[in-house]
């Protein structure tokens, strides 16, 4: 837990440097505060989606931990809030590709040693989807935004309505959302890793999840 907490916290600090272009990646590696058993490897910020990923190596096991920064209301507020509202509340899920790309980049650079993903808030959402997409053995997420919120039940309701009425236009409206939902559910069901979720009761996104509006 202590290592994932460190990586999660570091993701926010490194994100600030990447957005403001205050440090190059080499400077981050050379100047970033040290951890007794973790070594900084790589980081990246996607200016279109607001995704920031960081990678650290456990110097004892040589395993890699990937962390994703969460919603940032100071540095890249618009992209993160847009992702929260459009992609999570609306179930669009369009932000995941940048998180997948970062995972693939780290894997290609450093080998298939990624055993843990972590993140807070929106970053926890990224971490969960990356974990189930690549069946990563371990995940620790903090107050994670759910994978889907709001439209999950609406989509299911739309399918029920379509089945009852057999009206083609209803199928057209809901087909894409239903397909996305079923794909996510299938990946969740096939995930064999261990996902630890740490949350506080007053987190607004998790409140929605707890009443049955999403997966987290």
What role is predicted for each listed range?
Residues 6-118, 134-138, 145-157:
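A conserved cap/lid and substrate-binding interface adjacent to the catalytic center
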Residues 53, 126-129:
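Generic recognition of flexible, low-complexity loop/linker segments
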Residues 60-63, 132, 136-216:
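Serine hydrolase/lipase
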Residues 118-123, 127:
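Gly/Ala-rich beta-loop-alpha elbow adjacent to hydrolase catalytic centers
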């Amino acid at each position: 837990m202590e290592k994932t907490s460190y990586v999660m916290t570091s993701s926010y600090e490194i994100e600030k440097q990447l957005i403001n272009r205050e440090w190059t990646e080499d400077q981050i590696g050379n100047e970033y505060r040290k951890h007794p058993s973790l070594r900084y490897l790589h980081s990246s910020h996607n200016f279109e989606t607001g995704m920031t990923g960081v990678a650290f190596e456990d110097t004892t096991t040589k395993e890699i931990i990937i962390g994703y920064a969460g919603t940032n209301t100071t540095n890249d507020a618009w992209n993160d809030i847009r992702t929260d509202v459009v992609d999570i509340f609306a179930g669009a899920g369009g932000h995941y590709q940048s998180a997948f790309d970062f995972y693939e980049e780290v894997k290609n650079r450093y080998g298939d040693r990624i055993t843990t993903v972590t993140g807070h808030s929106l970053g926890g959402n990224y971490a969960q989807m990356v974990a189930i997409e690549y069946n990563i053995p371990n995940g620790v997420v903090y107050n994670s935004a759910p994978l889907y919120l709001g439209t999950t039940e609406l989509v299911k309701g739309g399918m029920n309505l379509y089945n009852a009425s057999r009206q083609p236009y209803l199928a057209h409206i809901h087909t894409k959302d239903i397909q996305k939902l079923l794909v996510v559910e299938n990946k969740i069901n096939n995930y064999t890793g261990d996902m630890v979720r740490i949350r506080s009761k007053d987190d607004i996104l998790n409140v929605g999840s707890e009443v049955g509006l999403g997966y987290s």
